[in-house]
């Protein structure tokens, strides 16, 4: 069992294992080097690194297009931006709360989850999170492939028909571009986390500068910002607005609900709690709102510049840039999109599921193998279908999974901050018979709390599919993230108080 004598407690609160304890747990079936606690000497991410991480992740095409779904639902431009800002400010709270154990103990998300769910039960939240990340990986890979396809079409004569006609609704060269971009992601995964940090550091300012230049060009070309900024909201009453605002806010929270769980995958490399927290607070809500605002302004100007284009095409930067006549402009723009999409895809959608799959089979699956599995599942989830319907993307995909991930976040935050008061036995997180074994490696309290949270958050649409309409449950689905988080947190805390785990005693139970 883990003891205080096997750890080194640093003055800034960070904890690491003594060399002999590290050597001992390295023989455990729950250990591999990708899941190992990071030594304090190797925790070197600064405020800039965390800010750059969020800036590069926020500068992606889905962020650029976020406002489009909200405006098409009836909001005006400032209502859409306030919704985005508020959603990202709210999700910052669970992100910071779950970031703390990463920096304090140097552990990734799947290992952190062992404290609440058990050494084997942690696979439940890890794999739930991984499947969502695989879907996001596929979406970003498809977007990156579209950017490459636009780039190739501009510089290679006859590119669009190079492989013949449409296959499965898309040209053969579209599929080829998708696979090339997919391969670029896998290449960076195999080069490791240090290359990722370098990519994030220079991708963040590069993408922001290029988008600002595109905005300046659009304003100059259109002699202003166009009509979108004077367009009125379609809602006549507060009640009408509220019906759209709540599910929209839930969707905005859901946009980064994945990272609200797995930020320990990054904060484990943090130089201090202050540096990781400041970097995230400064970068996340501001960057998301500013980049979405840029999308609104560029699209508004584009309405004037390209009046022949359909409304949905104007919100797609790939189709918009495809209208340019200058090859060099298209090349620079699409290179920017490729860099931005690579940065966000690997950081947001590969690091966590790769660790999650490694956690399920530590001795069989490495981080690299987990990344490859993520890429394959991302293709199988058919991202081109998820992106085909903008309203479905926001109100089904984002809202839907937010309830499930919030149910996990509620358990993790309650366990770490309320039940354990941030005190974890680091060595036991890697031991099959340590404190977190519970019953056969599963903490049934955490599992029940998660399932109850998911059930209440998802009950409305699930019952509606079989013809049972319960108005209250339909309303609760609009609040899916809040419902999942609140119900799971309350249920878990209640169960831990009424039937507390016996820790060491339960570990040795027969």
Question: What do these predicted regions represent?
Answer:
Residues 141, 145-154, 206-234, 255, ...:
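Hydrophobic alpha-helical segments and their helix-loop junctions in multi-pass secondary transporters
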Residues 47-64, 177-184, 190, 216-222, ...:
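Hydrophobic, membrane-embedded alpha-helices of multi-pass small-molecule transporters
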Residues 2-77, 92, 221-225, 235-247, ...:
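Membrane-interface "cap" regions at the ends of multi-pass membrane proteins
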